[in-house]
């Protein structure tokens, strides 16, 4: 079945017609942005390793933290990360030899997109996510980024609170409609 992405720039009657035809909201995402020119970078509280390329440690930890077990996903996802055009910043936090946090910054002109912020369940609420974001934002700013954006699943209040504490502000919401 077809899946439609709906955003505030679209005529609201289209969304209404989809609803009337049995298309339900499947996923809602909030987009947040910040101006890095006025951002006062603070040092990360946890030690964050930054690399321009994906590592197997990073990828394996991402699969584990996401609960990814599908062998097809495990085969395809690495090629997607390797195919990212432009400069990337991969952030990793370790506890000994174990990866306990990941993050990704993708630089595009004067923007950095922040993605894949994950912290292992036993390490949450210890400022690790904040440290990852701080390290990515600082590095992106040093590489010429003036603005940052990210997407957060609507209802993920912990993540939204973290991003707001860093200076991100809500910009808009988009959602997907599909028939079930």
What are these regions (language model features)?
Residues 1-8, 140-151:
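Conserved GNAT acetyl-CoA-binding A-motif
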Residues 11-25, 130, 154-173, 180:
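Conserved active-site alpha-helix within GNAT-family acetyltransferase domains
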Residues 71-122:
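A conserved beta-strand-loop-helix scaffold within acyl/acetyltransferase catalytic domains
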Residues 1-46, 177-178:
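Acyl-donor-binding surface of acyltransferase catalytic domains
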Residues 116-119, 125-138, 142, 161, ...:
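Conserved acetyl-CoA-binding loop-helix of GNAT-fold acetyltransferases
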Residues 29, 40-75, 94:
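Short amphipathic alpha-helix that is part of the acyltransferase structural core
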Residues 112, 125, 129, 146, ...:
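C-terminal, charge/polar-rich interaction regions
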